[in-house]
């Protein structure tokens, strides 16, 4: 098990309005100016958009896999995942769900992935 940045790139490439940006040596995936996923510099952890009110429960349910973002990012709708703890199927689910949070509902509804 375990996924890479290249796995993520392949997943997000077909997502409408999605693009990659490098900010402070960190790869981020965006829709417009909104970041929906970001890889930490060492590429072992990925932060992704996730409903703020659900993140504590997610982290508590699988603490070896998910973790809360650093204190400076707690104000965002964000949670983190250890990349060595997931497979490509789960990565796809996390990325597509995060992307859906950031695009207009019509765009999300039109996506068949």
Segments (PLM) and residue ranges:
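Charge-dense, helix-prone N-terminal extensions
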Residues: 1-113
């Amino acid at each position: 098990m375990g996924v890479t940045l290249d796995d993520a790139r392949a997943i997000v490439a077909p997502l409408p309005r999605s693009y990659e940006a490098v900010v402070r040596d960190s790869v981020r995936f965006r829709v417009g100016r909104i970041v929906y996923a970001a890889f930490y510099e060492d590429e072992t952890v990925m932060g992704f958009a996730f409903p703020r009110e659900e993140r504590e429960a997610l982290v508590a349910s699988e603490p070896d896999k998910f973790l809360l973002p650093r204190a400076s990012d707690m104000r965002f709708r964000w949670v983190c995942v250890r990349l060595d703890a997931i497979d490509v199927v789960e990565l796809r689910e996390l990325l597509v769900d995060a992307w859906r949070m950031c695009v207009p509902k019509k765009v999300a509804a039109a996506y068949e992935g």
